[in-house]
Regions:
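Pepsin/retropepsin-fold aspartyl endopeptidases
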Residues: 1-295
């Protein structure tokens, strides 16, 4: 925080009302091209399960970024890893540049092959989206950033669309977007929106899996890489999963051990909804009225 004295974090520069970034690569998560501190284009994946903008540890060293120490982070399956703290002067997102951006560092390059690109140098998390009216438009393959103003929201709401569903959300901690949903025929429960859950549409806490009568497919278990290390992943299928008034059937789920945030926030969190649940939709995050729109 001391490094931002006299400066405005997340200071936006650029013309126009919208900046668009096309998705690249063929992997399971959206990847966009950005520039850090005015350098060459690099590939970042998008993960609303993450908080701050993140840079690969080696990439941060190559850029000569300051090191403000480390904290312990908790990741999938309850894995722990040290997370570095730093900052960048500029992050260029399409036509816009954001100045004075706090960042965290982790060894993200190890995820490159699984994300279908030559090299991943970082990640865009939920905290950056706070400063925009942001849309992950999966059908059209692009990230759309609009200015966070009443006028932008009014223009968005006035756009013609087919089926559009608004789901109220709350924030837990600094980046956990939580809303009401249902698992199978269980009573309504709170679920975490994690578009960075690759290869699945759900990751449920073990008690919910058991209560819903969901069967783990142990014979199809495999190893996968997470930010905290390598995990044993066991697939399963959720016959019915809903978020607000959106319901999907036969949603692929992933079990990789204890769900570490089930009882962290003073309320019960039944699990998370991942990329496969949201990919049929354009998903807009409105942090002014605290709603997610699915179109």
């Amino acid at each position: 925080l001391e490094s931002f004295k006299g400066q405005t974090p997340y200071e936006l520069h650029g013309d126009g009302d919208t900046s668009r970034l096309k998705f690249a690569g063929t992997g399971p998560l959206p990847v966009v091209s950005v520039r850090v501190n005015g350098g060459e284009e690099v590939s970042f994946f998008i993960d609303t399960g993450g908080s701050e903008v993140g840079l690969d540890t080696d990439f941060a060293k190559e850029l000569g970024l300051p090191n403000f120490g480390k904290v312990q982070g908790t990741f999938s399956g309850g894995e722990q890893a040290e997370v570095g703290q730093s900052r960048i002067e500029q992050l260029t997102l399409g036509d816009w540049t954001v100045n004075n951006v706090p960042v965290m560092t982790l060894p993200f390059r190890q995820l490159s092959a699984g994300l279908g690109v030559k090299r991943i140098d970082g990640v865009i998390g939920t905290t950056l989206f706070y400063h925009f009216l942001a849309t992950l438009d999966f059908p059209n393959g692009e990230l759309v950033l609009c200015r966070k103003t009443p006028e932008s929201l009014a223009a968005f709401l006035a756009e013609p669309s087919g089926k559009s569903v608004a789901v109220p959300i709350w924030m837990a901690s600094d980046h956990f977007m939580v809303g009401w949903g249902r698992v199978e025929t269980l009573p309504p429960t709170l679920l975490f929106v994690d578009t960075g859950l690759a290869g699945g549409g759900a990751k449920l806490a073990e008690p919910i899996i058991k209560e819903a009568g969901i069967k783990l497919e142990e014979d199809k278990a495999y190893s996968g890489a997470g930010a905290g290390g390598t995990l044993k992943i066991v697939p399963y299928t959720v016959s019915r999963l809903s978020f607000g008034d959106i319901e999907e059937e036969n949603v692929p789920g992933l079990y990789d051990g204890p769900f570490p945030w089930e009882n962290t926030f003073g309320f019960h969190l039944a699990g998370m909804m991942g990329h496969d649940f949201f990919k049929p939709y354009a998903v807009t995050f409105d942090f002014a009225t605290m709603q997610i729109f699915l179109r």
